[in-house]
From Swiss-Prot:
This is Endoribonuclease YbeY. Zn(2+) binds at residues 116, 120, 126. Keywords: Cytoplasm, Endonuclease, Hydrolase, Metal-binding, Nuclease, Ribosome biogenesis, rRNA processing, Zinc. GO terms for biological process: rRNA processing. GO terms for cellular component: cytoplasm. The keyword NAD does not apply. Its main location: cytoplasm. PANTHER family: ENDORIBONUCLEASE YBEY, CHLOROPLASTIC. Its cofactor is Zn(2+). It comes from Clavibacter michiganensis subsp. michiganensis (strain NCPPB 382). It is found in: Cytoplasm. Belongs to the endoribonuclease YbeY family.
C-alpha cells in the first residue's frame, strides 16, 4: 500500500500513527494492497482556499477528500482493485479547535478526520440520514478497532 503523508502545516502530527490508521482502515475495508493514497496537512489559509475553490464555502474546514479512481470497498473474497484512491487534506488547526469541543486530543481528531476522508474516497457520504448512519457507523468501527489494535502495540 502506498500511503504518502505530507505535513505542510505548522502543527506537528504523529505521522506513523496516521500511517497505521490508514493501513488498518484500508485493510478493514478490503482495499487492494497496491492502492495509493496521499494525505496532506495544511494550515488554515491553504484550507480556506481549497474550501472556497472546491466547495464554494467560506472559511477553512476540517477535511476535504479528492477521489481519483472512484474505488469502492471490497470484500474478503473480492478486494477493491488496485488504483489511486485520491487525496485527503486535513487542517490540524481546525482539528485542534474541534478536539476541544469534542473533549479529546488533537491527534484523536486528526485520526477521526483521516478515517472520515478515507470513507469519502471510497464513495461514502452523509448527505442523507441513512447515509450518515452507515458512514459514521463505519467510521466509529474503524476508530474503535484501530484503538484496540494500538493497545496491543
Amino acid at each position: 500500500m502506498s500511503i504518502e503523508i505530507n505535513n505542510e502545516s505548522a502543527i506537528e502530527v504523529d505521522e506513523p500513527v496516521i500511517q497505521r490508521l490508514v493501513t488498518y482502515a484500508l485493510d478493514t475495508l478490503h482495499v487492494h494492497p497496491d492502492a495509493e493514497l496521499a494525505i496532506v496537512m495544511v494550515d488554515e489559509g491553504a484550507m480556506e482556499q481549497l474550501h472556497v475553490q472546491w466547495m464554494d464555502e467560506p472559511g477553512p474546514t476540517d477535511v476535504l477528500s479528492f477521489p481519483m479512481d472512484e474505488l469502492r470497498p471490497g470484500t474478503e473474497d473480492r478486494p477493491t482493485p488496485a488504483g489511486l484512491l485520491g487525496d485527503i487534506v486535513v487542517c490540524p488547526q481546525v482539528a485542534a479547535e474541534q478536539a476541544v469541543t469534542a473533549g479529546h486530543s488533537t491527534m484523536e481528531e486528526i485520526l477521526l478526520l483521516t478515517a472520515h476522508g478515507i470513507l469519502h474516497l471510497l464513495g461514502f457520504d452523509h448527505a442523507e440520514p441513512d447515509e450518515e448512519r452507515e458512514m459514521f457507523g463505519l467510521q466509529r468501527d474503524i476508530l474503535i478497532g484501530f484503538a484496540m489494535s494500538e493497545r496491543g502495540r
